[in-house]
Curated annotation (Swiss-Prot):
Its main location: cytoplasm. Residues 87-133, 202-232, 390-545 are annotated as: Disordered. It comes from the Eukaryota. It comes from Mus musculus. Belongs to the SPATS2 family. Detected in testis, in spermatocytes and round spermatids (at protein level). Highly expressed in testis, and detected at lower levels in brain, heart, thymus, skeletal muscle, ovary, stomach and lung. Residues 87-96 have a biased composition (Basic residues). This is Spermatogenesis-associated serine-rich protein 2. Pfam families: SPATS2-like. It is found in: Cytoplasm. The keyword Phosphoprotein applies. The modification Phosphoserine is found at residues 142, 145, 147, 520. InterPro entries: SPATS2-like, UBA-like_sf. Keywords: Cytoplasm, Phosphoprotein.
Length: 545
């Protein structure tokens, strides 16, 4: 394959001739690898290709790249790269073909398309790997080739996951090719029959999912894949959800770092608080010890003074022989006073001790400090697995159930024409018992309002968009007036093929697409039976005579 060479510049930028854009030059292998590793250290859930594309968009600036991944704007950058690749891919595919080869090479082109897509994908992988090995952008098509490879991989994965979608797409392609030489009705009928077959296979898968509830999730996963009309809308909704999920995961990593920082700060604060408490306790202990030393010194001083006074009194008792009576009385009174203060000596020995309320302090220490636990306000979403199967399987079952009586009712007039008289009489009795008011209205043919009501009702039933009113038509035609002989003497017998054609649209309605693919032809058949009003009047005159 020929590659377009890009103009290289020594200023660190590349001018792309194809897209007319200025791209940043990659640099050496070591610099690019260091930048990729720096971005990956902060954003670990991104691939090397995505990091390279975002680095290329921000001129190999690591800070802007990390900021783009953290804020979620990197997905917009990647989307821009993929859009350029899609435009180039469309240019490659649009090649003029002669009209004679278009009808003959339709299946060959459908087969060779994935082969042509796989060849550039393999060559593009080589160019990407060459970018990593050589360390610089060798080609201006490397980014576009990456987007094309991603697109082909996504298309192949979608075709593997949704074979029904692939079948419908191939049928659409063949229909578009056949439009040149064949009439427009055949591809439409082909697509209609293919869609009916697809819906039958879906109904079979739904019945299997009802019988086996264990495989219900997998069946729902296959049935939830829509056709190509709604696939783009669903993909855009999924893209928004993926962006939100990506932002949430990036913020979770940031919150994890915040939690670690908060834990470290709290532990540091706790250690600081207990260190202050320990220093306060030690200071208090030192103060109490100093206080005890003072108490001890005071008590010893008091006791020493008491000891000295006791020694003085003893000396005075030794010289009491030489004292006068008055001195003896004073000495006796001093000894008595000294002895009477002995209880204070005992109190002094008891008071000189340490007392404290340890239990209260322990309780206050136990309640000291609080740690706030994280509130788990997260809740699990209630699954809608009971609603999804009903919404998926309800319309098809309801349409089959509602179309089955409608398919059987319009064939009643043709069948009653061919039935024998006893069967018609029994049908008339049952219908007259079901609808007494209508039978009473038919007895009096002179009532013009009744005839007008019947005419309006019959015209309503001729409308194929109102299939629910065919039941009343069948009951009118099974009545006694319509089962009589003169009513249908002037009407030619209807061929069985016409009756089959009348019942075909309604029987095909069970598949869900027959009413759309084929026009409904019951209008002329009902108009043939409506204008015959004279036999009723002639029969009434014959009855009166």
């Amino acid at each position: 394959m020929s590659r377009k060479q890009s103009q290289k510049d020594s200023s660190g930028f590349i001018f792309d001739l194809q897209s007319n854009t200025v791209l940043a030059q990659g640099g050496t292998f070591e610099n690019m690898k260091e930048k990729i590793n720096a971005v990956r250290a902060i954003v670990p859930n991104k691939s090397n290709n995505e990091i390279i594309l975002v680095l290329q968009h921000f001129d190999n600036c690591v800070d802007k790249t990390v900021q783009a991944f953290m804020e979620g704007s990197a997905s917009e950058v990647l989307k821009e790269w993929i859009v350029t690749g899609k435009k180039k891919n469309k240019k490659k595919k649009s090649k003029p073909k002669p009209a004679s080869e278009a009808s003959g090479s339709a299946p060959d082109s459908s087969k060779s398309a994935p082969i042509q897509e796989e060849q550039p994908a393999s060559s593009e992988k080589g160019s990407i790997n060459g970018y990593h090995v050589n360390g610089a952008i060798n080609d201006a098509e490397s980014v576009d080739s990456l987007s094309e490879g991603l697109e082909t991989l996504s298309i192949d994965a979608r075709e593997l996951e949704d074979p029904e979608f692939a079948a419908a797409e191939t049928l659409d392609r063949t229909g578009s090719v056949l439009e040149n030489g064949v009439s427009d009705f055949e591809p439409k009928s082909l697509t209609a029959h293919s869609i009916s077959n697809v819906q039958q296979s879906r109904n079979a898968a739904k019945s299997l999912s009802r019988t086996t509830p264990g495989a219900q999730v997998s069946n729902l996963g296959m049935e939830n894949v829509p056709l190509s009309s709604t696939n783009k809308k669903l993909g855009s909704n999924i893209e928004k959800s993926v962006k939100d999920l990506q932002r949430c995961t990036v913020s979770l990593a940031r919150y994890r770092v915040v939690v670690k920082e908060e834990m470290d700060a709290s532990i540091k604060k706790m250690k600081q608080a207990f260190a202050e408490l320990q220093s306060c306790l030690m200071d208090r202990e030192v103060a109490l010890l100093a206080e005890m030393d003072k108490v001890k010194a005071e008590a010893m001083e008091i006791l020493l003074s008491r000891q000295k006074k006791a020694e003085l009194l003893k000396k005075m008792t030794d010289v009491a022989v030489r004292m006068s009576e008055e001195q003896l009385v004073e000495l006796r009174a001093d000894i008595k006073h000294f002895v009477s203060e002995r209880k204070y000596d005992e109190d002094l020995g008891r008071v000189a001790r340490f007392t404290c309320d340890v239990e209260t302090l322990k309780q206050s220490i136990d309640s000291f400090g609080q740690v706030s636990h994280p509130k788990n306000s997260y809740s699990t979403r209630s699954r809608c697995s009971l609603v999804a199967p009903v919404s998926l399987s309800g319309p098809s079952d309801g349409s089959a159930a509602s179309s089955s009586p409608d398919a059987s009712v319009p064939s009643l007039p043709g069948a009653n024409k061919r039935n024998c008289a006893p069967r018609e009489a029994s049908a008339a009795m049952t219908n007259s018992s079901d609808r007494p008011c209508q039978a009473h209205r038919e007895v009096f043919p002179g009532n013009r309002r009744g005839g007008q009501g019947y005419r309006a009702q019959s015209q309503k039933t001729a409308d194929p968009s109102n299939p629910g009113r065919h039941d009343s038509v069948g009951r009118y035609r099974n009545s006694s007036w319509y089962s009589s002989g003169p009513r249908y003497q002037g009407v030619p017998p209807q061929a069985p093929g016409n009756a089959g054609e009348r019942s075909r649209p309604y029987s095909a309605g069970t598949n869900g697409t027959g009413a759309i693919s084929e026009p409904s032809p019951p209008k002329p058949s009902f108009k043939k039976g409506l204008p015959q009003r004279k036999p009723r009047a002639s029969q009434a005159e014959a009855a009166n005579s």
